[in-house]
Amino acid sequence: MNTKRIRRDWNAQQRPVIGGSGRAPRRGWRGRVVPLLVVALVLPVVFAGWLWFHVDSSVHRIDAFEDYSGRPEAAAGTNWLVVGSDSREGLDPETAAGLHVGDASGQRTDTIMVAHLPDNSTVPTLISVPRDSRVPVPGQGRTKINEAFAVGGPHLLAQTVEQATGLRIDHYAEVGFGGFAGLVEAVGGVEMCLEGEMHDAKTGQTLQAGCQTLEGPDALTFVRMRYSDATPRSDLDRVANQRRFIGALVSEASSITTLINPFRAYALADEGAGALTMLDSDGPGDLLSLAWAMRGMSSGGLVTTTVPVTDATASKWDRQKASRLFAAMEADDPVPEDLIVN
């Protein structure tokens, strides 16, 4: 055997190729693209999970509604009590002046709504309860429903609504003046088309006719206005405008332009968490269910109306019509057409 030749061949195999770089071969395009795709897929999931945690940990909480003698039994679907309070908590005098909300002390309801999310294929329902409605308030006799919140907060209001409607309230969501304005600002304002000029004789604020983007202060003016030639039915026109605006706000908040923009999505989640008061038994998933149902308002996927009343003062309910409305909601049945008034 020629051992010298074998040794030369072995040494040649160990030498680097002349002119070679000695580096590992470059990765192909797949090696560069795949990691980027993984990051692109994982980051949104991580961001969404963080937003979920942020909302859940930042929202204001109150104790869950307790049972009491005569409380309505749970029925079909799920019922939300949605409240807009005139709370000025956290607003300094300058901010309150900029929002044109005055400086009244105490806390009252500026908006009372009941949202019914059915278990079947029936369209969800959102009804406004006029705040001047005179109903029995536990411990207070027959008085304005607004008084329940002023005296006993969310729990007495929920009990009052339950006894007046026969509907069991499962969830609660409340937003104050400052929180509402912040939500509107977080989505970049909400576009509304006004048929005519709206001038509020009480606050002196004016909204021009035509399509426009309403920012926080103007949005508050729109949803609160009832002393105006543009709202001849006073509170009945006001609550109709509130439902109209909330539908547009939810549509904007759930739009693809908002959801794919991390800065706007964060601002919305942050403002929403800071603005909302919910039951300690409620979570982000419950809130998403409500938002998903309400986003159909502008497209006809949500029935909206007001509790039937006997006159423009909206203080006395039409008991026969109101009973039919509440019975339909309790049974997950469609709301009769003659009860849908906007």
Language-model region placement:
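Non-catalytic, solvent-exposed segments at the cell envelope interface
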Residues: 2-342
